[in-house]
Amino acid sequence: MIKVVLVDDQTLVRQGVKSLLSLAESIEVVAEASDGQHAIDLIPGIKPDVVLMDMRMPVKSGLEAIQELAALKALPPTIILTTFDDDELVLAGIKAGAKGYLLKDVSLEQLVEAIQVVSKGGSLVQPVMTQRLLSGL
């Protein structure tokens, strides 16, 4: 069972993602956080296999949370799950230590695949984002 922590400031999004992930037999949502600071306080004690992290949140952003958890050597494999398809955010997230970047319009199958890949040490950026990043080189 892959233990996942959801971090998103929107309650409805957290509840929806949790509900969808409950359909995947290999994944269990073990905790939720509503902002980056809450994630920083929560994650080291839980030690999840994967974190799904929104980028833009109050108190501390997802990027700030990733950076702080990495500095504490407490960053689990993290997938950024956001509505923002900004190339600079993608690169900043990956540079900070995220192992994946997905937009919130992904299918359940794509999300489950990303969680499985990242939990095994891999990385995954949504194909549309990868194509844009590579075309910009």
Locations of regions flagged by a protein language model:
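Active-site beta3 strand of CheY-like receiver
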Residues: 46-52
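Receiver (REC) domain active-site loop signature in two-component systems and cognate sites
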Residues: 57
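Short, flexible helix-to-coil linker/hinge segments that flank and couple to helix-turn-helix
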Residues: 88-95, 99-100, 105-137
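Active-site residues of response regulator receiver
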Residues: 8, 54, 82
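Conserved acidic segment of CheY-like receiver
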Residues: 1-13, 17-21
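Short hydrophobic/Thr-rich beta-strand motif most characteristic of the beta2 strand and flanking loop
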Residues: 26-34, 42
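Conserved phosphotransfer cores of two-component systems
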Residues: 44-46, 68-75, 96
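Acidic catalytic/metal-coordinating carboxylates
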Residues: 35-38, 61-64
